[in-house]
């Protein structure tokens, strides 16, 4: 058995190594640079195609945008932008036309039985969580027919900052 595993590993190394698609990087991943994306170009396109308002919040200068993509929430397309925060956390905002209660339930397959309400800039924000530490909190609020969902791993202050900035932002107007 050991010989067959060794043969497979050697064959894998011989086939993959020359392609350049293999890298070995010892050490902590937190020391690697964050790959930055241009979220404004993505939001510009999404605002043109969306049936609901899209919001592009101001973010602290030391936050780095690292993802912009689409995601299905309950069968409907949503726009998602994510940032690495100053404290090396991660927050993403998903914007959809799916009603809040439905979107909170269908955001992903994770079970979040706990629910609480928080006040942020005078608006009630729903926070769904789980006793399982591997399940991230999900924060949700509706604004002018758009459901805003925030998830990730970051401090309450960072979540409050991005949620407040989003709630205070005007609907994005494409260039």
Per-region residue spans from a language model:
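Hydrophobic membrane-insertion alpha-helices, especially the h-region
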Residues: 2-19
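Ser/Thr/Pro/Gly-rich low-complexity linker/stalk segments immediately outside membranes or between
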Residues: 21-36
């Amino acid at each position: 058995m050991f010989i067959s595993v060794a043969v497979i590993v050697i064959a894998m190394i011989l086939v993959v190594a020359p392609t350049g698609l293999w890298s070995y990087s010892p050490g902590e991943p937190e020391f690697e640079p964050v790959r930055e994306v241009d979220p404004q170009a993505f939001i510009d396109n999404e605002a043109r195609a969306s049936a609901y308002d899209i919001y592009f919040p101001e973010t602290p200068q030391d936050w780095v945008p690292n993802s912009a993509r689409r995601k299905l929430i309950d069968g409907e397309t949503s726009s998602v932008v994510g940032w690495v925060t100053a404290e090396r956390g991660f927050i993403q905002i998903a914007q959809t036309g799916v009603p809040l209660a439905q979107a909170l339930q269908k955001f992903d397959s994770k079970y979040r039985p706990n629910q609480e309400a928080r006040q942020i800039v005078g608006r009630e924000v729903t926070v769904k969580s789980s006793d399982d530490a591997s399940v991230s909190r999900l924060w949700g609020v509706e604004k002018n027919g758009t459901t805003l969902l925030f998830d990730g791993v970051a401090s309450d202050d960072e979540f409050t900052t991005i949620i407040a900035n989003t709630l205070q932002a005007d609907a994005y107007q494409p260039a």
